[in-house]
């Protein structure tokens, strides 16, 4: 089975979005480094849905780039469902421009970043952030993209 993707496009305009193959590749280059099989839903949304979910689950009154919802199976239940990623199209596009990054690279970074959250990584504490950012950079560079944090390091 490897990594199974359920891609949901919940946006008014689907033009210019990465392809299903792009999203699959990004998952395939990230998750198998930690576990051999997984099911992941990626839902691409507009700002309204991202804002509502970010407010409900994180108490933040604005849309955000990616939300991660890990699936926690009941004890004793063997299931490959890793969780859901909710990615806001407008926020990703705006950030790519602001950060002077190629749009496809920023989409890839959001999938890698969100996948690491599903796998239990976090960036609340400085040491956790350093470890997570290091993994993100390694994975992104392994796919031929630049360090996603290069602007912050200069």
Curated annotation (Swiss-Prot):
UniProt remark on cofactor binding: Binds 1 zinc ion.
One GO term of the biological process aspect: rRNA processing
CC cofactor: Zn(2+)
Cellular compartments per GO CC: cytoplasm
GO molecular function: metalloendopeptidase activity; RNA endonuclease activity; zinc ion binding
InterPro entries in the cross-refs: MetalPrtase_cat_dom_sf_prd, YbeY, YbeY_CS
Chief localization: cytoplasm
Disulfide bonds: none
One Pfam family hit: YbeY
Keywords, alphabetical: Cytoplasm, Endonuclease, Hydrolase, Metal-binding, Nuclease, Ribosome biogenesis, rRNA processing, Zinc
Signal sequence interval, chain numbering: none
SUPFAM superfamilies in UniProt: Metalloproteases ('zincins'), catalytic domain
EC number: 3.1.-.-
Positions contributing to Zn(2+) binding: 113, 117, 123
Location in or out of the cell: Cytoplasm
Homology family: Belongs to the endoribonuclease YbeY family.
Function in brief: Single strand-specific metallo-endoribonuclease involved in late-stage 70S ribosome quality control and in maturation of the 3' terminus of the 16S rRNA.
Record-given protein name: Endoribonuclease YbeY
Organism per entry: Vibrio parahaemolyticus serotype O3:K6 (strain RIMD 2210633)
Protein's gene: ybeY
